[in-house]
Amino acid sequence: MTVACKAGAATRYGRSGGRIQPLRGFWAAALMFAFVLGFHAMTTPLQAQTPPLKLVALGDSLTAGYNLPGSAAFPAVLEKLLREKGISVEIANAGVSGDTSQGGLERLDWSVPDGTDGVILELGANDALRGIDPAVAEKALDAIVTRLKARGIPVLLAGMYAPRNLGSDYATRFDGLYPRIAEKHGLILYPFFLDGIAGDRVLNQPDLLHPTAEGVRVIATRILPTVERFLATLRPRS
């Protein structure tokens, strides 16, 4: 009986018996689960390492953040708003107080390094305040855009309006230079950088020329949809 029992056991639990088949299914499922986990572990770090878009805000004191901490300047505030919307981006502050369009052109190469994905160009306010011939400002801004395009760097152009005390002829010539440049180069244009705050005593500092921190937030919020449209046109770096 002992022998019969062993033989029966061999028949019941042998290689063709009922307990080996479930184990095969178990190990197959376990191997598949391990493969999925391994694949996820391999791909997730690669996704996490996708570099953020690198922008440069090239401008004057309106970009630099005159009398404001760096965290309250336009580039930092805009970057924060974009990140809150899930857009991975870094915006370098290349604003220089008092800079004219010609000044921006002269420092262009070191202000906008290689590897930049796009530029927000905000210059011209000081040209108008000094009464510089709009043709001079237009020539400098056109040269900036031309050189950036030659380097494969897209540009979002932020426009400016001339003070009306300079006369209607000057204002017409100055205000029109931004649409002309945008049309010539096929740029996205934000018509007036100070839209929503110009002349507002609450949103500007006592000089009525430079925005307060709250004024900067208004600027960044208003330009945000245009910046998002600009970012959608950028090609990711390889």
Question: Which functions belong to the PLM regions below?
Answer:
Residues 50, 77, 84-87, 103-238:
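Alpha-helical cap/lid subdomain in secreted, periplasmic
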Residues 28-41:
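Bacterial N-terminal signal peptides
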Residues 1-23:
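N-terminal secretory signal peptides that target proteins for export/translocation
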Residues 5, 14, 35, 85, ...:
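Domain-start "cap" segments at the beginnings of catalytic or binding domains
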Residues 98-102:
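N-terminal helical cap/lid subdomain that shapes the substrate entry/recognition surface
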